[in-house]
UniProtKB/Swiss-Prot annotation:
This is Allograft inflammatory factor 1. Residues 45-80, 81-115 form the EF-hand domain. It is a peripheral membrane protein. Gene3D superfamilies: EF-hand.
Amino acid sequence: MSETRDLQGGKAFGLRKAQQEERINEINQQFLDDPKYSSDEDLPSKLEAFKKKYMEFDLNEDGGIDIMSLKRMMEKLGVPKTHLELKKLIMEVSSGPGETFSYSDFLKMMLGKRSAILKMILMYEEKAREQEKPTGLPAKKAISELP
């Protein structure tokens, strides 16, 4: 029992999240300064939304979304995928040979012109938040509610 335990897990988690947010803000600034993306309208708010989404699914705060983080994201969206499909998704988005994709890869995919599966996933998540229109017959009204 010579190990020392860090009993301040919440504080350490907060520090890691702050460091992660700082790294992501630096990358966002690079994209804001890049003339290639200067024509995108409302770029700062898009980058802020992408940052929140990326931080939500980067479970281990290592700067990359791995296969388990992607699996969690897909299941949360109600679109579970097989291990092979997840590997293909990562290979499509990632610029390197690893089994993760970085925030820069994520931004290039989201701001790029090519269509990718993750772009559609985020679009479906936005649609899921919209209120569904009621179907079927309207509810019965009382006489006092009639015009």
